[in-house]
């Protein structure tokens, strides 16, 4: 028998190999991962590269990684180009103020590009678009309903109802007409027609048509056309000039001044006639359209009458207030009660007359005061006795006169003797 083959070593999986590599990296870089030095970081990169890629050239490895990145970027660019080519442009939706966004179908959802899902503020119900279609004023919606309403969808009750309507007496009396309902026209002219408009002539049972005939033009559209046809002022002037003809007078400065003078005179005459007419109306008692100024122009004597009437004004006062004020007794002063009597002046000090006299502050200049202080004479030195008495009565008091002989040589000798003979107290 041939010898048995040695059992093959079990092939290790990719995960186990990766774990082994990570363990080797941790052992070799123990305590160096948190180091911020450039050398330590470079050493860690080299260890990781050797363990993961073996003894490969680091340039080739970096080049391979760069190629992988460029391939990924190229794929993304291709996808973006395809989306730009085949994706239709969708403009941002705008909703009028006060409108509910849920009543508008999302434009991105219709193109299959909305990625918001339930968070989208617009509606994802495509049936809303059919419900929100504008009603055409040239099509009666009841005609479409009648076309769709066929016998295939009827039951017995519906069939009986249709027969009665079609061949009943009321249907026979009711005339067939192509006349447009007047309420329908008024609603369109006044911009009141819409989904919730109901015909006042019977609603859906109205016998008249709720559709405009082909070629019908509304009044508001006619007004717009008329406004567009209006010509400018320059064209109107040229048109009128062309219609005058050749037999007309040319405008010069003299003819223009004559025309202006004639017009002004006509205006003055017209104003005078109107004033006379107003005056006649005022005399007749018709003062409805006459102003206050015209009243005084027609009757100037009213101005003086108004001044005279202003003096004869009667003022109304309340008698009760005057009575309440004079309710207390008022007594007059009787001078006969005051009698002169002699008073005993013993023990009473009487003030001198000079005390009751008022001293008037003189407003002399400082130079005059200096002259008086230095012994100079006053200008009004020689005053009469009558003038001095008048000054005293009026409250003017002059300076006290100085006695020049008050301190003579004899008096000074007597004072010196008294000083020597004076006993000094110790």
UniProtKB/Swiss-Prot annotation:
Query: Which residue intervals are annotated with compositional bias (Basic and acidic residues) in the record?
Result: 14-28
UniProt biased composition (Acidic residues): 378-392
Gene3D superfamilies attached here? 6.20.400.10, Zinc finger, CCCH-type
Q: Which InterPro entries match?
A: ZC3H15/TMA46_C (IPR032378), Znf_CCCH (IPR000571), Znf_CCCH_sf (IPR036855)
The terms describing its cellular component in GO are: cytoplasm; nucleus
Molecular function GO terms recorded:
zinc ion binding
Q: Where are the zinc fingers (C3H1-type)?
A: 100-127, 175-213
Indicate where this protein resides in the cell. Cytoplasm; Nucleus
Q: Read off the Pfam families from this record.
A: DFRP_C, zf-CCCH
Q: Where is this region: Required for interaction with DRG1?
A: 237-261
Q: Where does this protein have coiled-coil stretches?
A: 219-283
Which SMART domains does the record associate with it? ZnF_C3H1 (SM00356)
Where does the chain cross the membrane?
none
Region of interest: Disordered: 1-28, 374-394
UniProtKB keywords = Coiled coil, Cytoplasm, Metal-binding, Nucleus, Repeat, Zinc, Zinc-finger
Q: Which domain of life is it from?
A: Eukaryota
Q: Which family does the record claim for this protein? A: Belongs to the ZC3H15/TMA46 family.
Job description of the protein: Protects drg1 from proteolytic degradation.
Subunit (UniProt): Interacts with drg1.
User: Can you say what this protein is called?
Assistant: Zinc finger CCCH domain-containing protein 15
Q: What is the source species?
A: Xenopus tropicalis
* Upper taxonomic lineage: Eukaryota, Metazoa, Chordata, Craniata, Vertebrata
């Amino acid at each position: 028998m041939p010898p048995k083959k040695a059992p093959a070593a079990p092939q290790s999986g990719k995960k186990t190999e990766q774990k082994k590599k990570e363990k080797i990296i941790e052992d070799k870089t123990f305590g160096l991962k948190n180091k911020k030095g450039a050398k330590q970081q470079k050493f860690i990169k080299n260890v990781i590269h050797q363990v993961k890629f073996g003894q490969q050239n680091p340039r080739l490895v970096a080049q391979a990684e760069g190629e992988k990145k460029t391939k990924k970027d190229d794929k993304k660019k291709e996808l973006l180009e395809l989306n730009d080519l085949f994706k239709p442009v969708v403009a941002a939706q705008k909703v009028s103020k006060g409108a509910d966004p849920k009543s508008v179908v999302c434009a991105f959802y219709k193109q299959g590009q909305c990625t918001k899902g339930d968070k989208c503020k617009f509606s994802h119900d495509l049936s809303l678009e059919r419900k929100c279609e504008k009603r055409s004023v040239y099509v009666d919606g009841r005609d479409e309903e009648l076309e769709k309403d066929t016998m295939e969808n009827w039951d017995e009750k519906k069939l009986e109802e249709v027969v009665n309507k079609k061949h009943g007496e009321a249907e026979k009396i009711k005339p067939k007409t192509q006349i447009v309902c007047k309420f329908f026209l008024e609603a369109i002219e006044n911009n009141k027609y819409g989904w919730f408009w109901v015909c006042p002539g019977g609603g859906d049972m109205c016998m008249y048509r709720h559709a405009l005939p082909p070629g019908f033009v509304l009044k508001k559209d006619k007004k717009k056309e008329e406004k567009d046809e209006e010509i400018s002022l320059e064209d109107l002037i040229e048109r009128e000039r062309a219609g005058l003809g050749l037999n007309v007078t040319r405008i010069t400065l003299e003819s223009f001044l004559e025309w202006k003078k004639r017009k002004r005179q006509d205006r003055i005459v017209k104003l005078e006639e109107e004033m006379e007419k107003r005056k006649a109306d005022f005399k007749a008692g018709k003062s409805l359209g006459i102003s206050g100024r015209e009243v005084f122009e027609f009757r100037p004597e009213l101005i003086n009458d108004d001044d005279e009437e202003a003096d004869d004004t009667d003022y109304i006062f309340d008698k009760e207030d005057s009575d309440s004020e004079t309710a207390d007794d008022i007594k007059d002063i009787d001078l006969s009660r005051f009698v002169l009597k002699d008073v005993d002046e013993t023990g009473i000090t009487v003030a001198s007359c000079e005390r009751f006299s008022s001293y008037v502050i003189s407003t002399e200049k400082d130079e005059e005061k200096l002259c008086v202080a230095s012994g100079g004479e006053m200008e009004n030195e020689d005053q009469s006795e009558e003038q001095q008495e008048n000054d005293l009565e009026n409250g003017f008091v002059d300076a006290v006169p100085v006695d020049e002989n008050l301190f003579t040589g004899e008096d000074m000798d007597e004072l010196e003797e008294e000083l020597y003979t004076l006993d000094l107290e110790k």
